[in-house]
Design a protein with these regions (language model features):
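Active-site-proximal loop/hinge segments that shape catalytic or ion-binding/gating pockets
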Residues: 2-146
């Protein structure tokens, strides 16, 4: 999710209970195709779901049928402004929708890795040297906070 709420908290360094203090520049976005992921999870006998808000909250709703993806507030997911005066609580909640797979996620399902900068992209390229599966690494600066 571009400019996620959690990324903002990491960027600002003000999330109680989170020991990571490295800011947003070292965070990568792992991109996968949802239908392919669901097919893999079903075949592996693993549960998957997507939520309509933050899965860490005590009141989230989840779905496990791709036909229900239309219930995700996609405008909220894409929103650049998700808090503050005049912004609906539905936007902040919807911005935190998540797709989850239990236990594990296989490397071969990744189709892309979004990074903050060219330098970070080069670092990720070095880390993936020698791997048979190479997701596309792309600088996606607009997915990060200014």
């Amino acid at each position: 999710c571009p400019r996620s709420v959690m990324l903002y908290l990491l960027h600002k360094g003000n999330r109680e209970g989170v020991t990571y203090q490295g800011g947003q520049h070292q965070i990568v976005h792992l991109v996968a195709d949802v239908p392919n992921t669901v097919a893999w999870a079903d075949e592996a006998g693993l549960r998957w779901a997507f939520t309509l808000s933050n899965a860490g909250s005590g009141y989230f709703e989840y779905r496990s049928d791709l036909a229900d993806l239309s219930e995700v507030n996609w405008d909220a997911v894409a929103a650049k402004t998700w808090s503050g005066t005049g912004v609906s609580r539905d936007i902040k909640e919807g911005k935190q929708a998540e797709f989850l797979v239990e236990q594990r996620f296989p490397w071969h399902l990744l189709i892309g890795i979004g990074v903050y900068s060219q330098a970070q992209g080069e670092h990720v390229t070095r880390l993936t040297t020698g791997l048979s599966h190479k997701p596309q690494i792309k600088v996606l600066r607009h997915w990060y906070y200014p």
